């Protein structure tokens, strides 16, 4: 499967904000955006006229990069969100939050979504006691997500549980000692703390 393999800090600089794609490094002064808070490339420092389309595109790219999706995956998810009742933009963000790799990340067991996605792919995550290896799996209310016994003994997992000071969203119940997260309810828009203006994404895809 295709995936981005370039420097992720470059993506943060392109969006002119921290997307927290490198874990602990993003909280330090070593983060490249602290030293170079402008887009990468030879014309990065130049002033660019921000058109309506550019603003819409940047919001879409920002959301896509935060959750680590390719364009086709993101567009398919948008199509599903548009087919549901309710507000399309909120539906999209809710479905992004309900991804299994995101729930593992939100629970504080992984330092980045890339790391949580790798654990799902490698079979280290169970949902209601059954192993699930699909990162895009949509969790539902009442689902219990847990790391396997083998994963719980991994040094990197224990390190994350001991050092990550992440606030677990209200729609999740986390039990760090058991590396377990329970989905209390589906997330509401006010419970999703991503810096994305979803209405601009809807406007972009509605053209």
What is each stretch, according to the model?
Residues 1-107, 134-207:
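Ferredoxin-like alpha/beta domains used as RNA- or RNAP-binding modules
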Residues 106, 121-122:
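Short, intrinsically disordered, mixed-charge
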Residues 119-120, 139:
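Short, well-ordered loop/turn sites that connect or cap secondary structure elements
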Residues 123-127, 131-133:
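Glycine- and Gly-Pro-enriched alpha-helical subdomains that act as flexible
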């Amino acid at each position: 499967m295709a995936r981005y393999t370039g420097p992720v800090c470059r993506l943060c600089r392109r969006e002119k904000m921290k997307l927290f794609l490198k874990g602990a490094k993003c909280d330090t002064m070593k983060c490249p955006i602290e030293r170079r808070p402008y887009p990468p490339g030879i014309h990065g420092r130049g002033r660019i006229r921000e058109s309506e389309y550019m603003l819409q595109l940047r919001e879409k790219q920002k959301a896509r990069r935060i959750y680590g999706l390719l364009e086709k995956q993101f567009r398919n998810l948008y199509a599903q969100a548009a087919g549901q009742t309710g507000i399309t933009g909120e539906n999209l963000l809710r479905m992004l939050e309900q991804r299994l790799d995101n729930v593992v990340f939100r629970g504080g067991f992984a330092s980045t979504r890339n790391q949580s996605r790798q654990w799902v792919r490698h079979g280290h995550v169970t949902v209601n006691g059954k192993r699930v290896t699909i990162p895009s799996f949509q969790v539902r209310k009442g689902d219990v997500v847990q790391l396997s016994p083998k994963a719980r003994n991994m040094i990197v997992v224990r390190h994350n549980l001991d050092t990550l000071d992440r606030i677990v969203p209200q729609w999740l119940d986390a039990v760090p000692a058991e590396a377990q997260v329970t989905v209390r309810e589906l997330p509401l828009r006010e419970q999703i703390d991503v810096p994305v203006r979803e209405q601009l994404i809807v406007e972009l895809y509605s053209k």
